[in-house]
């Protein structure tokens, strides 16, 4: 049976600048539970401890978000996203105290070593720990396998490849998922973004390659061009004969029901989202890049290229400002140089 992890109340928070209310969390968690969703992930878009001036502040804290969801769930498991450095061991302790069932410890795809203490902390408490390798397009299959093996050794019960930038094509997904499935003794999962319009296709390919866990959001509600759309994914999975706890009818009822209290809009793939996917930049960076380009008066797509050259990972918003400022200075120097040349030619 394929396990579906619903990130609507976590990754979806990116789409509305992390402003989900307690009432929305409770209503969606209850509806997802009734729809037979396996895991309902809740929190700031960047996970436990993510609320900040830099990343965006939530109107309610982690405790209230998790307590609200916990009270709404009966059969679905409650999950959280945790990035070491943004969150602390105390944040996991709080989540475990409240009754979180699944802690997804996420690191950059080449930094799995920093996940050890947090995976161990979760397992010691008797809860489920998943390892998550973010920005997975930035490492080849052999490197990803080596990193996933570290997480497995630390006690992770599954490893999820996260295509954080929506960069991957089906051939890349197949090669990487197959490598992990062949090399690990634990389940493999896949988390897609739709920047290139491939989220559902990539998720299906991941399942064909042996993945047992897929992430999705109702109506694709998520960062950038959105995540894998839950309803579309379940429909395609039914067509392909994949067994799940939910059904297309249940997730369609879930999607329709959310219009009354959440009303998530299925994201459209804008040129900025395509650029983010093409250049391999974290999907949540799009509004920050657009804002910086406007403030500094520089070309938005040139800024994408510059940031791609810097190989940005999640949590480096300050470098967006740095590169936009550098582009503006270079532009001003070029204009001054061109002005001198024109004056010399006119003399």
UniProtKB/Swiss-Prot annotation:
Residues binding substrate: 10-11, 164, 191
Keyword Phosphoprotein: no
Binding of Mn(2+), residues: 11, 191, 193
InterPro entries according to UniProt: 2-IPM_HCS-like, 4OH_2_O-val_aldolase, Aldolase_TIM, DmpG_comm, DRE_TIM_HOA, PYR_CT
Keywords, sorted A to Z: Aromatic hydrocarbons catabolism, Lyase, Manganese, Metal-binding
Domain of life: Bacteria
Reaction(s) the record says it catalyses: (S)-4-hydroxy-2-oxopentanoate = acetaldehyde + pyruvate
SUPFAM superfamilies: Aldolase, post-HMGL domain-like
Enzyme Commission numbers on file: 4.1.3.39
Biological process (GO), any one: catabolic process
Active site (record annotation): 14
GO molecular function: 2-isopropylmalate synthase activity; 4-hydroxy-2-oxovalerate aldolase activity; manganese ion binding
Site annotation Transition state stabilizer: residues: 10
Domain Pyruvate carboxyltransferase, first and last residues per copy: 2-252
Similarity annotation: Belongs to the 4-hydroxy-2-oxovalerate aldolase family.
Protein name as catalogued: 4-hydroxy-2-oxovalerate aldolase
Gene this protein is translated from: mhpE
């Amino acid at each position: 049976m394929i396990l579906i992890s619903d990130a609507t109340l976590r990754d979806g928070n990116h789409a509305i600048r992390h402003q989900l209310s307690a009432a929305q969390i409770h209503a969606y968690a209850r509806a997802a539970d009734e729809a037979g969703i396996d895991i309902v992930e809740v929190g700031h878009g960047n996970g436990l401890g993510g609320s900040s001036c830099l990343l965006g502040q939530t109107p309610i804290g982690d405790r209230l978000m998790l307590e609200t969801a916990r009270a709404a769930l009966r059969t679905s498991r409650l999950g959280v996203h945790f990035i070491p450095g943004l969150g602390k061991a105390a944040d996991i302790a709080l989540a475990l105290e409240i009754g979180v069932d699944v802690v997804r410890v996420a690191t950059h795809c080449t930094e799995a070593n920093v996940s050890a203490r947090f995976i161990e902390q979760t397992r010691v408490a008797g809860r489920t720990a998943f390892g998550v390798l973010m920005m997975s397009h930035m490492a080849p299959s052999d490197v990803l396998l080596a990193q996933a093996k570290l997480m497995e050794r630390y006690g992770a019960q599954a490893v999820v490849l996260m295509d954080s930038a929506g960069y991957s094509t089906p051939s890349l997904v197949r090669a990487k998922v197959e490598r992990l499935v062949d090399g690990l003794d634990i389940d493999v999962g896949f988390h897609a973004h739709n920047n290139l319009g491939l989220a559902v296709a990539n998720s299906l390919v991941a399942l064909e390659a042996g993945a047992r866990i897929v992430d999705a959001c109702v109506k694709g509600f998520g960062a950038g061009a959105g995540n894998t759309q839950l309803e579309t994914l379940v429909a395609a999975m039914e067509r392909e004969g994949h067994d799940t706890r939910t059904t297309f009818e249940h997730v369609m009822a879930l999607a329709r029901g959310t219009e009354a209290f959440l009303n998530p809009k299925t994201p459209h793939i804008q040129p900025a989202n395509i650029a983010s996917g093409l250049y391999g930049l974290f999907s949540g960076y799009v509004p920050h890049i657009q804002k910086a380009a406007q403030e500094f008066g520089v070309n938005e797509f040139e800024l994408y290229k510059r940031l791609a050259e810097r190989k940005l990972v999640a949590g480096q918003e300050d470098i967006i400002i740095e590169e936009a400022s550098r582009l503006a200075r270079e532009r001003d120097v070029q204009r001054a140089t061109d002005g001198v040349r024109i004056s010399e030619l006119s003399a």
